[in-house]
Amino acid sequence: MNLKRISEAKLPTPWGDFLMIGFKELDKEQDHLALVLGDISTDAPVLSRIHSECLTGDALFSLRCDCGFQLKAAFKQICEEKRGLLIYHRQEGRNIGLLNKIRAYALQDQGADTVEANHQLGFATDERDFTVCANIYKILDVKAIRLLTNNPEKIKILKKEGINVVQRVSLIVESNPNNQDYLSTKKNKMGHFFKK
């Protein structure tokens, strides 16, 4: 495993107080975060979200995607249970990087959908590697998870990596006129679920 736990600190949020744990992928010099609420060391399945970094949605409040809305909803759902884990997966733009994401946005402005834009730039539909997230679960000794996701690929990869995903929990947020085509593409071309 090429992942190391580096440091931790308290992180108060509007929804609750988390323990923020920093990890580093040693071969890629890439950092990731685990935000822990409550005791996740028991055998009871942990409500968990793997949230891939989206600077435009998470920090700049973009309406082009549902990422920022999903992040807030995940924090809220975890805090309602008073126990959970949010992994902030630092693979921006489905792991094509911020500048390539801006290039993909420009192609979308010209009529391409999110999948077509990635392909036109020479990338796969989704370049993310969720094995690093599986390794975070293992380092934190999480026995079983209830995964907050609409993405069946996350579940498939985590199970393949030996993570006990006992339930998929829907993460449904409101759409808006700016992201309806994006959400439709995620459903129709990427197989995402959008029903509870």
From Swiss-Prot:
Cofactor: record remark: Binds 1 zinc ion per subunit.
Enzyme class name: hydrolase
GTP-binding among keywords: yes
Reaction(s) this enzyme catalyzes, per UniProt: GTP + 4 H2O = 2,5-diamino-6-hydroxy-4-(5-phosphoribosylamino)-pyrimidine + formate + 2 phosphate + 3 H(+)
Pathway(s) per entry: Cofactor biosynthesis; riboflavin biosynthesis; 5-amino-6-(D-ribitylamino)uracil from GTP: step 1/4
The UniProt record lists the keyword Cytoplasm: no
Cofactor(s) listed in the protein's UniProt record: Zn(2+)
EC numbers for this chain: 3.5.4.25
Keyword terms of this UniProt record: GTP-binding, Hydrolase, Metal-binding, Nucleotide-binding, Riboflavin biosynthesis, Zinc
Amino acids binding GTP: 49-53, 70, 92-94, 114, 149, 154
Catalytic residues identified in the record: 126 (proton acceptor), 128 (nucleophile)
Record-level GO BP terms: riboflavin biosynthetic process
Entry GO CC: cytosol
Annotated GO MF terms: GTP binding; GTP cyclohydrolase II activity; zinc ion binding
Stated family: Belongs to the GTP cyclohydrolase II family.
Protein name, entry field: GTP cyclohydrolase-2
